[in-house]
Amino acid sequence: MAVLPLSGAIRLSRGDLVIETQTQDPWAKKLITQGTDKACADLDVQQIQALKMKCAMIMFAQYVQGNTFGQVVKMAEAVTDLAKKCTEVDRDNPNCRKPLDWIFLNTICQEDNLPRFTDCCAKKDPERNDCFLSLKNSSRGFISPFERPNAEAACKNYSEHRHSLPGYFIYEVSRRHPFLYAPTILSVAIHYDEMMKDCCRSAEDSTHNLEECFRRQAPKVVKPIREDGLRQEHTCGILKKFGERTIKALKLVQISQRFPKADFFTVTKLVSDIANMHKDCCRGDMLECMRDREEILHYVCTNQDVISSKIKKCCEKPLLQRSECIVNAENDDKPANLSPQVREFIEDKGICERFAQEKDTHLARFLYEYSRRHPEFSAQMLLRIGKGYEDLLDECCKTGSPDNCCSRGEEELKKHIYETESVMKTSCDIYKEKGDYYFQNEYIKFTKQMTTIGSKCCQLSQDKLLPCAEENVSLLVDLVLGEICRRHLTNPINPAVCHCCSSSYALRRPCMGKLEIDENYVPLSLTPDLFTFHEDLCTTEEEKLQHRKQEFGIPLLLSYPMLINLIKYKPQITQEQLTSITVAFTAMREQCCKEENREACFAKEVLVTLSPICS
């Protein structure tokens, strides 16, 4: 299947299916831009039909996750055939003027053997659509995970089913990720097809390593699904937990940093549009999500002269590349006449009056002005500054002399920046002293990203350390904390974690950083199976040993499960005790790996290893 040179105007609108224009195919009208995009010239009728088919398959697979590939294809063909008939021979058909989501849901409801959706199909729109959305299930295990195929078998399958395989890939990804943005799925499908073509092209070449080829290229396919899915889940989690106001504040900060030359009106319009897009996307409404996304991109590129000088090349790209390009574009240069400070938000005599009359607008202007001046700060840090400013005005405007009260705001700000810099400096000191292994042990799940950030940022001077670390670390830490809080919802940890996850998004990281040992936690009992070791601990293969070292951490040479159980057994363990156990663990490993019955030796010597905390 040819790689589609998609243009910048994919628009699956909820408007009428038939539109009176020169373009006869209504879907084509929504899939092709208004004649300004040169890339559209590369889309022939067959490619447009293929693109419509893919979009329909994504929606049906996400809505009816249990359907077979054949059933999804059948429904997608029914919808695309209707679109074709509406423009050629049956323009007066009443269904041709129905919204697309009505047509999609009616197609599902006409299918047999779908008892799960009977109640939804009995409802009227928009309640029917909401019912369908509520049945989407993204939990692990709802659909069996992907099984990694043998490379040779995969290439054989590709050669025999080359034209249908990309569609099958779209189907499998869509039903496992019912909330994943359709543009992401379309994009990774292109990468998947390219990977299969490239790796299987030389399958008969004896010098060609198929496994290595797939191993090298698979991240281009898997990484966007995982990362975009995580970011989307994270954003939707913020929206659900903290509401639209928090999402708007976060986007206001990010857009102001990215486009410092854009005026306040333009920025707030983008903020509102993006917040509305996330509401539709987080509901799982793919049609509205794609329409919102396209309209935002169209607005940004149409008004790029007043938004940013860094996105011209992005706006010349096809849609699927355009969106990613703009998101990853560097921040535009700050206006030459931009003052270094925003003292008017502290010193202005009418500040309390404006705060009382238009609180959210005043705070938005402060965040906008402060963020566009400080691209070196993370979005989370700027939100904390905004929260501090709001609290300051809440307090000071109630007093008789707000001037004296507000003047201390600058000192509070300096203190917060200093504390943030100190955290970064401490982390880098640990990195420089202990190296990668210890750093990986501190951030077990996100090891590779953290060590990359450490090696990149910790070599810089102090004045450049904070910008580098804030930009890279804060997003990663924010994603980690978001995942912790989502897990806390289903498996509560303790009241302190609940407070950090619920009270304030902006203050979540410092709140988590100040958590103490849970005094109500009941330690695990010491049982024979709590610390068990097997022969694989004695591996001599360098690669496995290296992996195990990464798993153990340095200086704590303990396996990941043992480390967890150790802390659960002795939550108040000291650094001295950890050091003693490290030495004993190393000695135990060296001794028992020489024995004939290694596991019996481990079972006996583990008590000696744990003696520093058992005495």
UniProtKB/Swiss-Prot annotation:
Sorted UniProt keywords: Copper, Disulfide bond, Glycoprotein, Metal-binding, Nickel, Repeat, Secreted, Signal, Sulfation
Motif stretch (Cell attachment site): 14-16, 283-285
Annotated compartments: Secreted
A single Gene Ontology CC term: cytoplasm
Main location: secreted
Cystines in this chain: C109-C121, C120-C131, C155-C200, C199-C213, C236-C282, C281-C289, C301-C315, C314-C325, C396-C405, C428-C458, C457-C468, C485-C501, C500-C511, C538-C593, C592-C601
Residues modified by glycosylation: N137, N157, N472
Classification via InterPro entries: ALB/AFP/VDB, Serum_albumin-like, Serum_albumin/AFP/Afamin, Serum_albumin_N
Claim: Flavoprotein is one of the keywords in the record: no
GO MF terms, alphabetically ordered: metal ion binding
Signal peptide range in chain numbering: 1-15
Reported modifications of this chain: Sulfated.
Coiled-coil positions: none
UniProt keyword annotation of Transport present: no
Domain Albumin: 27-218, 223-415, 416-609
Role, per record: Binds copper, nickel, and fatty acids as well as, and bilirubin less well than, serum albumin.
Family: Belongs to the ALB/AFP/VDB family.
Subunit structure: Dimeric and trimeric forms have been found in addition to the monomeric form.
Protein name per the record: Alpha-fetoprotein
Organism encoding this protein: Gallus gallus
Gene coding for it: AFP
